[in-house]
Amino acid sequence: NNLNNKGRILNKIVECYTTTDGIYSNKYHKVLAQMNVTTIWTTNYDTLLEESFRHVSTVIRRCDTDLLPIVDIDQKVEIIKMHGSVDSPSPENLVITKEDYEDYFYTHPLTTERLKNDLLNKSFLFIGYSYRDSNIRSIMTQIRQLCSRGTRTHYMVVEKEKNVNSYKLQKLWAKDLERFGIKTYIYENADQSHRELLEIMESIAQKSKGNTLFVTGSHTVEESAFLEELGVELARIKNLTLINGQSKGVANIVLKSFIDECLNLGQSVQNRIEIYANPCAHNEDWETKEEYGALLESFKYRLVRQTQIMIVLPGSYGTKAEIEKAKQLGTIIIPIITEDRNELIDELLENINIVERLKIFSPSLYHSLKNEQLTTVAEVIECVKNILAV
């Protein structure tokens, strides 16, 4: 009888999630895809996360046996669907009924062990759950069992209960979670917009990339007083990490002066720079060859996903591709107006979202860009410092 009941529920779930009417990824999925994370655990059955990460290399774990193969997941995002997926070859394995939840640790030993390992070694951010949610109870059980072994600090963001008594219970639940290393933030949602949740997620997405900055532009530039000064001033920003993916040109000039200034300051260069091997370093023609498209896409994604701030100078095909990837991943873009500005910079200046985003960080840079005046190093540094200070 239980099997028959599960079969009916299963058919309804599959029918619901396999129709295309009204089920689309939303702004929250988009922000998740912008985060610099390696693993996402979800109890949802749908494929909206996969859709949101379609521009990203992913490894999907739909069931226990998916965790068996040792797969090279370097630079990929792992999505673990601990309760199964509607697109699984064996949808009957979806965790649906009360019995499924109660027997989960026995029927999914590999997933359970992986969950234990991640809870011990990674910090989790729980989103979309409430204290009454059965989906979260099994995970809380694991954390309680592991807390004596010193788990990492975990975080939970939940919507405030509207009922007074429910809110009291919610606060007690949140207080209890502190004993197990889980810090809970309860946000107001009176207008049902979940605006604060989105703001929290956007802030996390930005900060997940670290205090990182990437300078992109033409490979043909050989010298520039502006870039040399920029490299020196960037090196003087404490805890800033400079990302480099060019062997010559704009980024390399900045890198050289950045390293020189770090050495002058007696700082370890190893802790201040991250260098990514560029497959086009010795043959720039590869940028335009279709057969190398997947390789270049992977390279640019790995580089930009680590970048919080991108400074853009005039460039060509490669620079444009990096800008497009930065837009997808929510990177803060700072266009630079120089005497040799080209249409690539003009396109950025015409992008209201990019320019307006800089207004709160540096009014002087914002007004210079709006008035199409030459950018100064001082304006750029002010903007970068204020972004990192948020």
Outline where the language-model segments fall.
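A phosphate-binding glycine/aspartate-rich beta-alpha loop in the early core of alpha/beta enzymes
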Residues: 1-15, 67-73, 261, 265
